[in-house]
């Protein structure tokens, strides 16, 4: 069973639909015992980092998530919350990944690309060998919606570029994974990534 952590950060229907198409059993929950008994854990979400962290603290899940031993996948703000710190609300994160979250600025534009904020659209991803990207060709395209990004660091397993800004498309540390893009909105390639997450053995 997959636990989808519900911490009041917006509509979870798209990730539920994506898991349903893969035939996966899931439970949307904020219950610690359900989360600890799950085979996989998803931390999705959209919204603002400081309020999202406050919701995790209020439920005590900020202490639970970093101690999980099963595969955990953070999506979009879920990945950002697993980093050391976010400039969005100047808030400390869960500290799983050794990255900091920064805001795109107009200075990130390049001569070839004047960026818009938020970044909305498709970007190709350069990925290292990882069970999360098994069977996905290097340079595959994924769908993004975000104004903040995680800096590249030792935990970066995939990166992309917006304007002249390189940033982490995906992070991994042990059993913890994160993706900045939305696999549930990225067509067949995103479905393959979710399938890899559901079937991987660590």
How would you describe each model-predicted region?
Residues 67, 100-202:
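Amide-donor transfer/coupling interface in amidating biosynthetic enzymes
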Residues 2-24, 183-185:
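N-terminal beta1-alpha1 ligand-phosphate binding loop
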Residues 21-28, 54-57, 122-128, 160-162:
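Short gly/ser/thr-rich secondary-structure transition/capping motifs
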Residues 34-35, 64, 170:
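Structural alpha-helical scaffold elements that stabilize or flank donor/cofactor-binding regions
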Residues 47-119:
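Cysteine-nucleophile active-site neighborhood
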Residues 25, 40, 71-73:
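Structural signature of beta-strand start/N-cap positions in the alpha/beta core
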Residues 42-44:
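Structural motif
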Residues 1, 26-37:
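Short acidic low-complexity segments
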